[in-house]
UniProtKB/Swiss-Prot annotation:
This is GTP cyclohydrolase 1. It comes from Histophilus somni (strain 2336) (Haemophilus somnus). Zn(2+) binds at C109, H112, C180. It comes from the Bacteria. The keyword Heme does not apply.
């Protein structure tokens, strides 16, 4: 963990302590070794599906998949990729709600390894610290870039911002379409899943929670 930022370590420890960290193992192989291993196994999987890897359209697919898994869609499993965040002292004494709405969410269902596509809204009441608005998008993306279930993802985002901002006053709302429902099984193309998580004043005060949810509808 020596190559991890202090923020990454604090967030990871908070998630582990609360029991909401993604089930992960400690990896002993470096990225290149893991890419090679995944590529080899994907060759066997693709053959078992019945595809011809000698075709020029498919021959590089195992390598593409290995790079995609390690460097892109599952890069959030590595806390070395946690966004660099600088807390800014709240010298302006901002006391009103800060809301970032409609943050793009693209994740992967850990049950079937197909897409979760949706939007995330994050709000907080600044206490000692504020952070750059783009950092909210980056933290959401970090936790999305790993196999996920939406309920846990929502809780992870909440606790991450509570830890970074050193305040309980955080709210998270997620609305997403699950392609494991859309493209297989029931094949429901219309339904979506909504999850939310509230802390501090958002949890304790009904009017504050109502204000947050009302703003999402505008």
């Amino acid at each position: 963990m020596s190559n991890l930022s202090p923020e990454a370590i604090k967030v990871r420890n908070a998630l582990v302590e609360k029991g909401i960290e993604t089930p992960m193992i400690d990896l002993v192989q470096d990225k290149d070794q893991r890419r090679q291993g995944i590529e080899q196994h994907m060759r066997e999987v693709i053959k078992l599906i019945g595809l011809d890897l000698s075709d020029d359209s498919l021959e590089e697919t195992p390598a593409r998949l290995s790079k995609m898994f390690i460097d892109e869609i599952f890069s959030g499993l590595d806390y070395a990729n946690f966004p660099k965040i600088t807390n800014i002292e709240n010298r302006m004494k901002v006391s009103e709600m800060v809301l970032v709405d409609d943050v793009t969410l693209t994740s992967t269902c850990e049950h079937h390894f197909v897409t979760i596509d949706g939007k995330v809204s994050v709000a907080y009441y600044p206490q000692k610290w504020v952070i750059g608005l783009s950092k909210i998008n980056r933290v959401v993306a970090f936790f999305a870039q790993r196999p996920q279930v939406q309920e846990r993802l929502t809780q992870q985002i909440l606790l991450a911002f509570q830890t970074i901002l050193e305040t309980e006053d955080v709210a998270v709302y997620v609305k997403a379409t699950h392609f494991c429902v859309k493209c297989r099984g029931i094949k429901d193309t219309n339904s979506y899943t909504v999850t939310s998580a509230f802390g501090g004043v958002f949890l304790d005060d009904r009017e504050t929670r109502k204000e947050f949810l009302t703003l999402l509808k505008k």
